[in-house]
Amino acid sequence: MLLKLDSRKADFQADFTRLVDERRESEGDVSRDVSAIIADVKKRGDVAIAELTQKFDRHDLNKGGWQLTQEEIKKACDSLPSELMDALKLAATRIRYCHENQLPESSEMTDAAGVRMGVRWQAVEAAGLYVPGGRAAYCSSVLMNAVPAKVAGVKRLVMVTPTPDGFVNPAVIAAAVISEVDEIWKIGGAQAVAALALGTEKIKPVDVVVGPGNAWVAEAKRQLYGQVGIDMVAGPSEIVVVADKDNDPEWLAADLLSQAEHDPTSQSILISDSEDLIEKTIEAVGRRLEKLETQKVARESWDKHGATILVQSLDEAPALVDRLAPEHLELAVADPDALFANVHHSGSVFLGRYTPEAIGDYVGGPNHVLPTGRRARFSSGLSVIDFMKRTTYLNCSQEALSKIGPAAVTLAKAEGLPAHAESVISRLNK
């Protein structure tokens, strides 16, 4: 049943705390299964990959091919409607522009002691992108993960995607081409993540693995982190909409359902100072659910995890939002920037009535790969930084060392590390 809260009620804080603490991520214990798959790939390599692909995807890699061929890629792109191809290209252009403006600059300075120091940013050499497979076209996820990697300067970008019965969605292939993906492998699941992280006879390992997936994919990324970098371990999608009385309930209902239709464990929350707007929005959600193709999933999400919060003033909203730290936040109010100034924890924020979250999913520009499960309190969405690393460097002249070296000797001796001290002393005494 939809949760309806009212900040004027005596039990509001307790009820809101339960909402914040609600656990929606899968509690199924897939850890043991994933550990076994990783161990199998580590031991048997391509043989394990082929067997698991046959088992889960009913695709014989040795007969149907491990990688997409140029002929298969061309055929897929040619089959796409021009309208869809144009939309993919527009989205890629906008994502590229946004992420080019995120590139960090290397820097160097010389301090008063004459020590030259700096930081140099470089892209990782290889990155792996996981794309969910089947007939669902997650083409936007390809763009959102692959374009930043190439903007960062990644030379080898590898995509893996499950191919149930040998099928790969043409829109996914086209998005990979537009994003300049270098290799497309017909494998999926935890075994694909293991192949990217560990490498096999056919597949060279990568340095970073990104991309969405099911519980097994997320668990594989978690277990392999440290051997390979990852973007994040994401959970169910979520949205908080803060709205004043001057909104169209139909618009708000559509926005709330845009996240509810993702997964039964997704969460959609409406915060408003207008009880009338809340009630009309709830009614609009009900009407829209009757016509929605994804109504089964969306209804379960809305009924089990949806919530409305009536506040006395929208000034209360930022504090509530910060406790929820949502993946997506819409500020559908007259002055969204004023409210935004007081919000500190959200994966991405959509300002004003004409900026639905769905625009950010596809063509807005900023990345749609965002922290969930309140992780926006300490982490950020995917960016070029996830495909880069920084190296610091120092350069001391003899004169510079003579100025700062004695302090290093003192600290080394205080820590009981004589070899450290001698490393500096030997140069000071020369």
UniProtKB/Swiss-Prot annotation:
Protein name, per record: Histidinol dehydrogenase
Annotated positions binding NAD(+): Y130, Q191, N214
Chain positions recorded as substrate binding sites: S237, Q259, H262, H328, D361, E415, H420
Residues annotated as signal peptide: none
Cofactor remark from the record: Binds 1 zinc ion per subunit.
Function: Catalyzes the sequential NAD-dependent oxidations of L-histidinol to L-histidinaldehyde and then to L-histidine.
Any one Gene Ontology molecular-function term assigned to this protein's record: NAD binding
Keyword Transferase part of the UniProt annotation: no
GO CC aspect terms: cytosol
EC number: 1.1.1.23
Keywords assigned by UniProt, alphabetized: Amino-acid biosynthesis, Histidine biosynthesis, Metal-binding, NAD, Oxidoreductase, Zinc
Record's keyword annotation contains Amino-acid biosynthesis: yes
Residues that, per the record, bind Zn(2+): Q259, H262, D361, H420
UniProt family annotation: Belongs to the histidinol dehydrogenase family.
Requisite cofactors: Zn(2+)
Reactions it catalyzes: L-histidinol + 2 NAD(+) + H2O = L-histidine + 2 NADH + 3 H(+)
GO BP, sorted A to Z: L-histidine biosynthetic process
UniProt pathway: Amino-acid biosynthesis; L-histidine biosynthesis; L-histidine from 5-phospho-alpha-D-ribose 1-diphosphate: step 9/9
EC main group: oxidoreductase
Active site positions, chain numbering: E327 (proton acceptor), H328 (proton acceptor)
